[in-house]
Amino acid sequence: MPKGTIVKALSGFYYVQNEDGLFQCRGRGNFRNRNIKPLVGDEVVFEAENKTDGYVLEIMERKNELLRPPIANVDRAILVFSAAEPTFSPLLLDRFLVHVEANGIEPLIVISKIDLLTEEELETIKQYRNDYEQLGYKVYLTSTIEQLGLDAIRKEFDDHVSVIAGQSGVGKSSLLNAINPALDIETNQISSHLGRGKHTTRHVELIPFGSGLVADTPGFSSLDFIDMEPEELSHYFPEMRDRLPSCKFRGCTHTQEPKCAVKEALAQGEIREFRYEHYVTFLEEVKTQHKRRF
């Protein structure tokens, strides 16, 4: 049986790509019975007598899976956040970072629209860039209007399956179009009434991009910490993860406990205060979600 990758899911059809071309397939009924849904990015076994009448028979084991956007087997998450319109939100960025770290995906941070900033505002954004780079993240400052930073990002897509995600209205589609004008992905102007972008991308699709594949996904602005245990959260903050073995108490939440290596590092300025505050905010959310489950 042939194998391939689902590159698009739309209206009950799954479009499977392999070396022989693109095949339009439906899922077998037993997927529904087993509560399994094929996802874009899935490696699958399928059968097809022609290019428009195939069936997905088996889904290979996934290395990871995102719920929003619904996609599997992602290598990298390109997280696009605007410096302005909408205003840069490190709180939302950290929420995304936790989400992708928890799924074993390598994040890259892109801060767009830097052409809209004053010199003082740009210095603030550069400080954030330094903060995140010190944690080991790659950070790019870009402007599609002034064509800044695009060449460096273009290389990051090669030989990877990447998802491009971020807050609605930050210019994800514009960024992809600027890097590869042949894509011509639909874009909308930001809604002046709401101060938020319209959701121009209505389905998930993997698009050939250099020697890799990229998914331009529906914009979204919130992520829930579903199924996460409270003691897990600190593992997704790199500056905390390395210090966990030095905490006195196993299962330390790094809030009230004595002899906490994380709080000691915070007091010494080795952990940025805004990152710790975000951790505490997320921890309360995780605890609330946990109580709802049990």
From Swiss-Prot:
One of its GO terms (biological process) is ribosomal small subunit biogenesis. GO terms for cellular component: cytoplasm. Signal peptide: none annotated. It holds the Pfam family RsgA_N. CDD domains: S1_YloQ_GTPase (cd04466), YjeQ_EngC (cd01854). PROSITE patterns: ENGC_GTPASE, G_CP. It comes from the Bacteria. Monomer. Associates with 30S ribosomal subunit, binds 16S rRNA. One of several proteins that assist in the late maturation steps of the functional core of the 30S ribosomal subunit. Helps release RbfA from mature subunits. May play a role in the assembly of ribosomal proteins into the subunit. Circularly permuted GTPase that catalyzes slow GTP hydrolysis, GTPase activity is stimulated by the 30S ribosomal subunit. This is Small ribosomal subunit biogenesis GTPase RsgA. It comes from Halalkalibacterium halodurans (strain ATCC BAA-125 / DSM 18197 / FERM 7344 / JCM 9153 / C-125) (Bacillus halodurans). The lineage of its organism: Bacteria, Bacillati, Bacillota, Bacilli, Bacillales. The gene is rsgA.
